[in-house]
């Protein structure tokens, strides 16, 4: 009963927070493609008072742990996706959620894809704003082959980029 009440209270608090931005809520979307150009997921980004809420629907992803980052350039040229640049890092912090001199604004937790290749995730990034992600050269969501170790510079030893999507209004 207590667990149910706490769960309901958490959902209600999130709905109230999002309702406070209704009408004024800004959203953006990134369509993720693999190195062959096949669409394999979408990420919807919603501005909330404390940052950006990311809601991802992934399909046809390889099983395993993968780094999931915001990169600093809004380009996704296959097959390497190097055109997306490094992690979004306007404050020029060190890389890594576990780094005392970090993290980059684009650092986010790893994702864990099951054997069927499908995953729904929601996560908050309190280090970014939607207008900040859309200005200048824009930004992109990038998924790496391996998980981020949360400390190595410059990118967490996460391996090659396996998916990329430009963040657009």
Q: Where is each model-derived feature located?
A:
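Bacterial N-terminal signal peptides
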Residues: 7-19
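N-terminal leader/targeting pre-sequences
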Residues: 20-169
């Amino acid at each position: 009963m207590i667990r149910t009440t706490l769960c309901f209270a958490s959902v209600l608090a999130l709905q109230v927070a999002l309702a406070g931005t209704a009408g004024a809520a800004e959203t953006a979307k990134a369509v993720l493609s693999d190195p062959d150009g096949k669409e394999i997921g979408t990420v919807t980004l919603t501005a909330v008072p404390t940052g950006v809420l990311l809601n991802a629907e992934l399909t046809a992803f390889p099983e395993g742990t993968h780094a999931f980052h915001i990169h600093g350039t809004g380009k996704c040229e296959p097959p390497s996706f190097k055109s997306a640049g490094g992690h979004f890092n306007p404050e020029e912090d060190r890389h890594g959620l576990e780094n005392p001199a970090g993290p980059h604004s684009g650092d986010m937790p790893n994702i864990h894809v099951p054997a069927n290749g499908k995953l729904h995730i929601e996560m908050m990034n309190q280090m970014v704003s939607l207008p900040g992600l859309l200005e200048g050269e824009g930004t992109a969501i990038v998924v790496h082959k391996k998980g981020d170790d949360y400390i190595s510079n410059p990118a967490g030893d996460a391996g090659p980029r396996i998916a990329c999507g430009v963040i657009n209004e």
